[in-house]
Design a protein with these regions (language model features):
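Helix-rich effector regions associated with P-loop NTPase G domains
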Residues: 1-7, 17, 32-35, 47, ...
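Conserved hydrophobic positions within beta-strands
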Residues: 39-41, 102
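Short, Lys/Arg- and Gly-enriched loop/turn segments at beta-strand edges
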Residues: 97-106, 144-145
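Conserved beta-strand/loop subsegment of P-loop NTPase cores
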Residues: 131-138, 160-169, 190-196
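Histidine-anchored nucleotide/phosphate-binding helix
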Residues: 148-158
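Walker A/P-loop
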Residues: 227
């Protein structure tokens, strides 16, 4: 029966069977996934990337290059300005004990990006891939806090849909009440604010819970005590003042590179100090859309007389009326106007 059924096959089906018989006994190449190990890019150095592989692999950090095919795809698509960024989840083909080749890059779930410093054209420079949140550290005093710098970063974070927590360090210098007088406005519009003192250990437990098993962008002006705060998170850390920036090899905001710094609690807890906070650009935000990233304006902007109201000079503006009533903080509104007019 079987033989007669074979005889009734079409010539095309017979050719297919012969092809399968010819090649079915040949050794098959291994599936790509069996040769690859998963990891996260913790540092970028030119065309080389330090990849920390997942627990259980032979080598936790490998120096990797990118597969030529991926580079060719980037050249063909000029819109892909940053092929591999710190924070990217990648798949690496090991090469020896310490090296590897990046074969695949997982899709990013979030990014923190900016205009390339010194470049006037629109170009996306991904500072960090897949961040979970941002921690903006300011000091209550020494140095004096400049909230317009904070407002500018909050716009960038809102645009990137990046949850942000504000940490106010050095409250031992002013007292909590004085710090709240400056930063309480951010609590009132929905931001979480942690009042801390590295000197007295206040607010440390809140910070630890905030960071566990997350990739956190840590940023803020120089001298606000970022390293001192991190020292208090775990007794195994012994960073001196400035050591965090030295560890990240960034000097004083002189490079665009970032690096993930693993913390010794949780399974995948990383912090990343972002370089060049003063160079963060609002390059991809149309001025008319800036209002969407000042969260306190949202409940008022729909009540403006003109649908395209910029909340600057137009009559019957509900946002300006809210400022006059004190419902919107005047300093925040002034920050909005400065950004609206490009006075960064």
């Amino acid at each position: 029966m079987a033989r007669r059924r074979v005889q009734r096959l079409s010539e095309e089906e017979q050719d297919l069977m012969q092809f399968e018989d010819r090649y079915k006994n040949r050794p098959r190449p291994k599936q790509e996934s069996t040769d690859l190990v998963a990891g996260i890019v913790i540092r970028a150095r030119g065309h080389h990337y330090d990849v920390q592989t997942d627990p259980g692999t032979d080598n936790r950090v490998r120096v990797c290059e990118v597969r030529g095919r991926l580079l060719a795809e980037q050249i063909a698509d000029r819109s892909k300005d940053t092929l591999v960024a710190v924070g990217d989840h990648v798949w690496v083909r090991p090469n020896g004990k310490e090296k590897g080749l990046i074969e695949r890059i997982d899709e990013r779930t979030s990014v923190l990006s900016r205009q390339r410093p010194g470049v006037n054209v629109l170009a996306e420079d991904v500072i960090l891939a897949n961040p979970d949140q941002a921690l903006v550290v300011f000091a209550a005093a020494d140095p004096e806090p400049h909230t317009r710098m904070l407002d500018r970063f909050l716009v960038i974070a809102e645009f990137n849909e990046l949850p942000t927590v504000i940490c106010v360090n050095k409250i031992d210098l002013t007292g909590r009440a004085a710090a709240e007088a400056i930063f309480g406005q951010y609590e009132r519009i929905g931001y979480e604010v942690i009042y801390a003192s590295a000197e007295r250990g206040e607010g440390i437990e809140q910070l630890r819970e905030l960071l566990i098993d997350r990739i956190t962008v840590v940023t803020g002006p120089s001298g606000v005590g970022k390293s001192s705060l991190i020292n208090h998170l775990d007794q195994r850390l012994h960073l001196q003042v400035g050591d965090l920036r030295d560890f990240l090899h960034k000097g004083k905001h002189t490079t665009r590179a970032a690096q993930l710094f693993p913390l010794p609690f949780g399974e995948k807890t990383y912090i990343a100090d972002t370089p060049g906070i003063r160079e963060l650009g609002l390059y991809d935000i149309d001025p008319i859309d800036l209002q969407f990233y000042f969260v306190e304006m949202q409940e008022y902007r729909h009540d403006c007389h003109y649908s395209g109201c910029t909340h600057d000079h137009e009559p019957d503006c509900a946002v300006r009326a809210a400022v006059e009533r004190g419902d919107i903080d005047r300093e925040r509104y002034e920050s909005y106007l400065r950004l609206l007019h490009g006075e960064e």
